[in-house]
């Protein structure tokens, strides 16, 4: 489960044991090919030039729901991972997108 804080696009991820970890949304996008939305997260408080692991998930945004809780889904296929990695590479290598 993810709980979103509107300030600075902070998201709290809760694991199976109930531990909460704070992340910041790097960006999100929708893929017409897979008809899914994706969100990429980095640890909150990371420095801009710091090398960090980026977490990626699929999610279903609900435009009519004001809830700040939503479900994240694992990306399961290799093809989806390749697409997400390609979008991330484009984001990281294009100064105009940051």
Swiss-Prot record:
Record family assignment: Belongs to the UPF0473 family.
InterPro entries, alphabetized: UPF0473
Pfam family for this entry, one: DUF1292
Protein name (record): UPF0473 protein LSL_1108
PANTHER family hit by this protein: UPF0473 PROTEIN CBO2561/CLC_2432, UPF0473 PROTEIN CBO2561_CLC_2432
UniProt organism field: Ligilactobacillus salivarius (strain UCC118)
Domain of life where this protein originates: Bacteria
Coiled-coil boundaries: none
């Amino acid at each position: 489960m993810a709980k979103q804080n509107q300030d600075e696009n902070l998201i709290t991820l809760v694991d199976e044991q109930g531990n909460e970890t704070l992340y910041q949304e790097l960006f999100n996008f929708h893929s017409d090919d897979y008809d899914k939305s994706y969100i990429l997260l980095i640890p909150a408080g990371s420095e801009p030039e710091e090398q960090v692991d980026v977490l990626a998930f699929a999610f279903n945004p609900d435009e009519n729901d004001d809830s700040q809780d939503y479900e994240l889904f694992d990306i399961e296929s290799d093809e989806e991972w390749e697409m997400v990695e390609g979008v991330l590479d484009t984001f990281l290598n294009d100064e105009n997108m940051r």
